[in-house]
Amino acid sequence: MSMTNQQRRPPIRQYQGEAVTYIPLTELHPFPDQPFKVREDKAMRETVESVREYGVLTPAIVRPCESGGYEIVSGHRRKRACELAGTDALPAIVRDLDDDAAVILLVDSNIQREEILPSERAQALKMKLEAIKRQGARHDLTCAQVGYKSDGKKSVQIVAEQSGESKSQVQRYIRLTELSPQLQELVDKKQ
């Protein structure tokens, strides 16, 4: 049985002060142009086994879709692990996020992973930079959603500080996005 946003299951628990709800996998949609690939590698196999044994320990973060269901902001790998483990729902925190806040949260929740290809990091940093630039004078409206203030800094400096990269390294990564997909693949393969 499919549930609408209004009919979703009641919260099952609290996670860091937020209500967690089981959402059927069929109602979860990937974030558009999400730069991080969901690989079915050893780490995924281990995640699937963990989901089978313990369930999903950290809930996904989703936002309601206007067309129904939910868009995954953080939790694409957990959703795939649930599919492979044979479960039908994913514990998630539902947040009302505008597009820019969702992009920033998506990038921030994935950028520190160890297995990120240079092209993925480049696209993620570019997405975050563009989202911060779009916010412009609206930092006061969205800073609570993403947890920072600009303090008059340039967008690229904010991205650099939050990603642990230098400003020039962030700019180099972003230039990678201008390469053809074939050249990006060669960079990813270190060729």
What are these regions (language model features)?
Residues 1-95, 101-115:
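Short, charged/polar connector segments at secondary-structure boundaries
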